[in-house]
């Protein structure tokens, strides 16, 4: 089963929902900035992640952006300036 790399960024307006979404995302990928995660997921895991995040956000106030970056493990689309977190090299761990 092919895995894809996703960049997930969010703007959650309320602290409780923000913590809830962040906690959810920690089960799917690696945090690379405060509200930005990189996730290497199968198609099924991507569907689960989307549903889990949608259940925790308020669509009328919050925003989540999910970008498909191509095959998992390909870091060639990233360019960092200054200090940055290491990109994930392993599959997602769903708790």
Task: Give names to the regions the model predicted.
Residues 1-7, 13-95:
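Basic nucleic-acid-binding interfaces
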């Amino acid at each position: 089963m092919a895995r894809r790399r996703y960049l997930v960024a969010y703007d959650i307006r309320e602290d409780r929902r923000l913590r809830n979404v962040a906690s959810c995302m920690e089960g799917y990928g690696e945090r690379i900035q405060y509200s930005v995660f990189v996730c290497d997921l199968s198609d099924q895991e991507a569907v689960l992640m989307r549903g889990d995040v949608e259940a925790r956000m308020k669509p009328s106030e919050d925003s989540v952006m999910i970008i498909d970056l191509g095959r998992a493990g390909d870091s060639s689309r990233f360019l960092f300036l200054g200090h940055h977190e290491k990109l994930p090299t392993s599959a997602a761990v769903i708790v």
